[in-house]
Design a protein with these regions (language model features):
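Hydrophobic faces of well-ordered beta-strands that scaffold small-molecule active sites
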Residues: 3-8, 29-33, 59-64, 99-101, ...
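Glycine-enriched alpha-helix->loop->beta-strand junction motifs that scaffold or abut catalytic
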Residues: 25-28, 95-97, 131-135, 183-188, ...
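Active-site gating/metal-coordination segments in enzymes
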Residues: 44-161, 166-168, 222-223
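An N-terminally biased module of ancient metal coordination in phosphate/nucleic-acid-related enzymes
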Residues: 1-58
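Generic structural signal for hydrophobic
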Residues: 21-22, 91, 129, 180
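A short acidic, amphipathic alpha-helical/loop segment
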Residues: 16-21, 46-49, 124, 202-207, ...
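Short, surface-exposed connector motifs at secondary-structure boundaries
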Residues: 1-2, 159-162, 183-190
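H/E-rich (His + Asp/Glu) clusters that bind or coordinate divalent metals
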Residues: 12, 172-175, 179, 188-240
Length: 240
């Protein structure tokens, strides 16, 4: 079986068009990552329907958390932790195969009161996910140039992805992820977009060696191609 380890975000408008793409390119199985449309509307029901109408073992769904929880339980770590576990359990019971977290994308953290990942509010979720061996597809950070006004590309800037001092720093988010893994080394994490370490392959290699359950996916932004092409021998050695 040939594998390409990437992800796509799913909404109800994608079904027929996605079927055509899968047939054209011979995609036998896929995983749909659910993030809220327009920031708040869940795509989980649509993705589960798509899964239900296709043969077993050909479609998998990573369900997204409800963003209302960040406001409903703001300042109440115990209630939030309990809610996150309940939500995740309900997603699996409904037919999801894992959890999609976009909560590490900096503009999401800028717009929603999401606690730091290594604080008590998240601890019940990480503990549950580790004990239950739940796959988590986690978007953490963005390309490092999004914090540099002189390097960010015009498209990213037009999308609101320039991050100034009011937005969490990428290294601070990496610190939080490393702290979570230090406490929960058995977490089955798949870190999206090569963890935005395509320009730091030795650092990524060290992370993967230390935590055997951690994976990265190859869903590319432009920066991934550019960074890997900047040192082709090193990139080839990493993948080999």
């Amino acid at each position: 079986m040939q594998l390409f380890d990437a992800h796509m975000h799913y909404s109800d408008t994608h079904g027929p068009a996605f079927d055509a793409v899968r047939e054209r390119h011979g995609v036998g199985a896929c995983t749909l990552a659910c993030i809220p449309q327009m920031g708040v509307c869940s795509t989980v029901p649509d993705a589960l329907y798509y899964k239900a109408v296709h043969p077993e073992g050909t479609v998998y769904v990573m369900g997204g958390l409800e963003r209302s929880a960040w406001f409903l339980h703001e300042g109440d770590a115990a209630a939030l932790g309990e809610d996150l576990v309940a939500q995740a359990g309900a997603l699996l019971a409904a037919g999801c195969d894992g959890i999609k977290l976009l909560e590490g994308k900096p503009d999401i953290r800028r717009n929603f009161p999401i606690p730091d990942f290594d604080t008590p509010a998240w601890e019940p979720f990480w503990r549950w996910a580790e004990e239950q061996r739940v796959p988590i597809l986690w978007h953490v950070n963005d390309p490092e140039e999004f914090w540099d006004a002189s390097r960010i590309n015009p498209y990213a800037k037009s999308e609101g992805w320039f991050y100034g001092p009011e937005t969490i720093n990428n290294e601070e988010q990496y610190r939080q992820v490393f702290a979570v893994l230090a406490c929960h080394p058995g977490l089955r994490l798949q870190l999206a977009h090569l963890f935005f370490f395509s320009a730091q392959l030795p650092r990524l290699s060290a992370l993967l060696r230390r935590y055997p359950e951690v994976r990265v996916d190859l869903t590319p932004g432009i920066e991934l191609y550019t960074n890997l092409a900047g040192d082709i021998p090193a990139a080839r050695a990493f993948f080999e």
